[in-house]
């Protein structure tokens, strides 16, 4: 998986209206900033986003837009536009579109899919989520551990 774009629109902790357009030519991204600037909160926000997509029964944690690619050659692009304001159920709150990379090197027109199609099946498989999500926090805190427990 490669995250291409993240826009946290509504406030998540101290992160407000933050846009990150990740360099799609690099596989590594480094977040650098002063203490208290929100680096760890960005990582936690991503964990909360993928947790909601993975479980499928949680409301959108905040308003955001996320674009990421899956596959060894980034052959699928998934775009998620989510907000608690879009409706009262998790399915209404998540607008998801998928594009497929064609032989010409161009992505197809996006196809809308439901959150229920993204969520993992009983065997833990999903065509629209990464197989693994890893996060590391180097502080004396279990803030991320609690988010991973249901998985």
What are these regions (language model features)?
Residues 1-151:
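P-loop NTPase switch/coupling surface
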